[in-house]
Amino acid sequence: MTNANGNLKKCPITISSYTLGTEVSFPKRVKVAAENGFDGISLRAENYVDALAAGLTDEDMLRILDEHNMKVTEVEYITQWGTAEDRTAEQQKKEQTTFHMARLFGVKHINCGLLEKIPEEQIIVALGELCDRAEELIIGLEFMPYSGVADLQAAWRVAEACGRDNAQLICDTWHWARANQTAESIKNVPADRIVSIQLCDVHETPYKELREESLHDRLAPGEGYGDTVGFAKILKEHGVNPRVMGVEVISDSMVATGLEYAALKVYNATKKVLDEAWPEISPR
């Protein structure tokens, strides 16, 4: 797998954007990721827009990546695509921004989710339309237990029913654990339709408001009660060959300790999990 800046590992270990918080600059994000072992960074549309507002150009961003031998390996996050009413001018602009980012950085897939709870028939139609707008890019649909696509089975139903080859899926440890997914949950999902994996972990007791927990209080892989090792083994044994192994530890308390600490902590935790569960793609 390659991007516009050169060669990549087959499955780059990628630090997700939220793992380093929302306030960090583009140069700092790249530097911290590179210095703490990661192969790539995930970049949200908001991160990209902030970089432009800070005076960087596309060429500047590519140069900064090249200087650190770093890649953007994931682009995110498309939401509010389920109905015509939700697709406001702002939403459409953000969607086009993610398409531009993916092509600029040579990323083949874009992460998306649907928070709105609408009829499944409408989700199927809307997902197909989103895939058509994405053209050659893959749409990675992420199931979330508090969303309109609550579990892996629902995600695969709509991806299959929309009839687009570029409708694929994302599996995240946090959502997997909180949606009570098991090896049985993945049995009917083709392995080649899972485009990426995101590692983290969960507390023993869920918050009353799951989205609040998801966006503020995740744990590093293998350090909680979500059985991250077991999760990774299930995906490996199913035959999944992800384009990206993301590490999405969204934690206010961890970011508050410092970006370097956060990056090194989640890198080491990820390596420990993958050494046990999936040594073929564990960082060396």
Pin down the residues of each PLM region.
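Boundary/entry segment of secreted carbohydrate-active catalytic domains
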Residues: 3-24, 76
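Active-site beta-loop-alpha junctions enriched in small/polar residues
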Residues: 16-20, 44-48, 77-80, 115-117, ...
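Gly/Pro-rich active-site loop or hairpin
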Residues: 30, 52, 86-88, 152-156, ...
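Structural motif
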Residues: 36, 44, 104-105, 192, ...
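Glycine-rich, proline-tolerant flexible connector loops at the mouths of alpha/beta enzymes
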Residues: 42-66, 117
